[in-house]
Amino acid sequence: MGKWVMIAVAWLAVAGGAVAQTAQSLGAPAGSAERGKKVYMEQLCYTCHGTVGQGGDRGSGPKIYPNPFPYAAFATQVRKPRQVMPPYSDKHVSDQDLADMYHYLFSTKPSPVAKDIPLLKNF
């Protein structure tokens, strides 16, 4: 089976089952969400993907949260992207940086919708 087919199958398995997941259960090495946030901001990932992976305001970067995909797919996309995203070699983003960013994205919480914010209910 090709690498992309295996990644797609793994992603569908993860997306289909709403089991309590951890970053490690999706194949990520140990990492620090705090350090991952720093790397994510320093590498300017937020300019396309939003501050917590919710997608870019201009639609330039796809949403990468709240549906986490396997770590292998994340790492492959960062290293050898298939879209307009620039590649990040291990000279720019270390393997540990990748793990840390994954832990950061996995730890983020979705923003509330406007109707659930009391001050915005009347607008």
Predicted regions and their residues:
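Positively charged n-region of N-terminal signal peptides that target proteins for export
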Residues: 1-4
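Electrostatic cytochrome c docking/interface patches
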Residues: 19-41, 55
